[in-house]
């Protein structure tokens, strides 16, 4: 099994992290270890390849960054757990759809460990609780290698989601783990559990 490096990076600025992710993907070869980065970002909107300006309703003072991942606009901020997956899909013998499924199921597994019943939707990537979106996915594949990843709402200020049509869906309600649990979850514990779930679903456990 190829090596997997997992980095818990804490709160890091979006743009330098994006550049580091691009650089790793650009410079890697068949011997480069796969990496998963688990982190938080300061407030930022990111607009995917399919992103339409009309879904940015009122960004205000929050910066907007155009990126090469799939999907529409989303929001990142403190208290949201972001996982970036830099994986050699050919080496893992994984298709993009299989990777998306593994990511979604990892989130379902993680949330189930907290007693939260969540599920993916066939027509809208991400993970949902009773129709409300708790996690978003957006990937890019270059030369058979993935980058970008997923974002799970843990314990955060949700109001910036009201400034956009999340993922291009007007009126889509976003939800977070804190709202579904008797007490706020420990962020570091959620991060560790997501690492374990991703390792298991990707065959690294």
From Swiss-Prot:
Keywords: Acyltransferase, Cytoplasm, Transferase
Name of protein: Octanoyltransferase
Keyword field contains Transferase: yes
Functional summary from the UniProt entry: Catalyzes the transfer of endogenously produced octanoic acid from octanoyl-acyl-carrier-protein onto the lipoyl domains of lipoate-dependent enzymes. Lipoyl-ACP can also act as a substrate although octanoyl-ACP is likely to be the physiological substrate.
Residues at the catalytic site: 167 (acyl-thioester intermediate)
A GO term from the CC aspect: cytoplasm
Residues annotated for substrate binding in this entry: 69-76, 136-138, 149-151
Gene3D superfamilies in UniProt: Bira Bifunctional Protein, Domain 2
Single GO BP term: protein modification process
Pathway assigned in UniProt: Protein modification; protein lipoylation via endogenous pathway; protein N(6)-(lipoyl)lysine from octanoyl-[acyl-carrier-protein]: step 1/2
A GO molecular-function annotation: lipoyl(octanoyl) transferase activity
Superkingdom of origin organism: Bacteria
Family affiliation: Belongs to the LipB family.
Main location, first listed in the record: cytoplasm
Enzymatic reactions: octanoyl-[ACP] + L-lysyl-[protein] = N(6)-octanoyl-L-lysyl-[protein] + holo-[ACP] + H(+)
EC number: 2.3.1.181
Subcellular location: Cytoplasm
Record carries keyword Transferase: yes
Additional observations: In the reaction, the free carboxyl group of octanoic acid is attached via an amide linkage to the epsilon-amino group of a specific lysine residue of lipoyl domains of lipoate-dependent enzymes.
Pfam families: LplA-B_cat
Coiled-coil residues: none
Site (Lowers pKa of active site Cys): 133
């Amino acid at each position: 099994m190829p090596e997997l490096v997992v980095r818990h990076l804490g709160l890091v600025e979006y743009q330098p992290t994006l550049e580091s992710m691009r650089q790793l993907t650009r410079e890697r070869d068949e011997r480069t270890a796969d990496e998963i980065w688990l982190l938080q970002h300061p407030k930022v909107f990111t607009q995917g390849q399919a992103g339409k300006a009309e879904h940015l309703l009122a960004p205000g003072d929050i910066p907007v960054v155009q990126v090469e991942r799939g999907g529409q606009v989303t929001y990142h901020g403190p208290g949201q757990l972001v996982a970036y997956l830099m994986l050699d899909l050919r080496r893992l013998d994984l298709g993009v759809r299989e990777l998306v499924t593994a990511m979604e199921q990892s989130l379902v597994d993680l949330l189930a460990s907290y007693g939260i019943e969540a599920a993916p939707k066939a027509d809208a990537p991400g993970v949902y609780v009773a129709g409300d979106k708790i996690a978003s996915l957006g990937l890019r594949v270059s030369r058979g290698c993935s980058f970008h990843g997923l974002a799970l709402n843990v314990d955060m200020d949700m109001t910036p989601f009201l400034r956009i049509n999340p993922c291009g869906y007007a009126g889509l309600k976003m939800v977070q783990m804190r709202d579904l649990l008797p007490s706020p979850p420990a962020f570091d514990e959620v991060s560790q559990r997501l690492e374990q779930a991703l390792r298991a679903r990707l065959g690294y456990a």
